Amino acid sequence: SRIINAENYDEKRDAISHDWPQLLEKIESNIIFIPNSLTNVEDFLNDIGVNGLILSGGDNVGDDKERDDTEIKILNFAIKNQIPLLGVCRGMQIINKFFSGSIEKNNNSSHVGNSHVVNLINNNIISLLKKNSLEVNSFHNNIITTSNLGKNIESFAITDNDKTIEGFSIRFFQLLV
């Protein structure tokens, strides 16, 4: 979850968009938020028992070391325990960096506060969704392109105009972003 500074207080707080609990409730998932301030993320995840994890969006990789560190620990836990992981926007970016990829500054205003079409380029995803393209919302200031994908990452959704990667999976792992 995103880390914010509470107005009129000298403290950090974890925050998540209300869209997440509403969506997860609709699909009848139990929701447990993982605090960014835990000293042992792996013990916490083992204690609660998880069958899927989400790295949510909001803010940029590198904006808050505490969040970056927590999400790297979550990612390591997911890989070690073969737990499916979904990375959305910032979550996708930190996963790409974890696998030795990079992110770059977005110079295309069509990605910020807009919806746009992405093309699906993986036959398994096309078969699953029964379509060749999707309209997605977009709020990211940083992007992943075909030239800066990490090791073992395979894109499945890409924009027409600037070849921004909007979805990828890890070749050896149940990870979808």
Identify the residue ranges that each predicted region occupies.
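Beta-strand-turn-beta hairpins that frame and shape the catalytic cleft
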Residues: 170-176
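N-terminal beta1-alpha1 cap of cysteine-dependent amidohydrolase-like domains
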Residues: 1-90, 97-104, 109-135, 141-164, ...
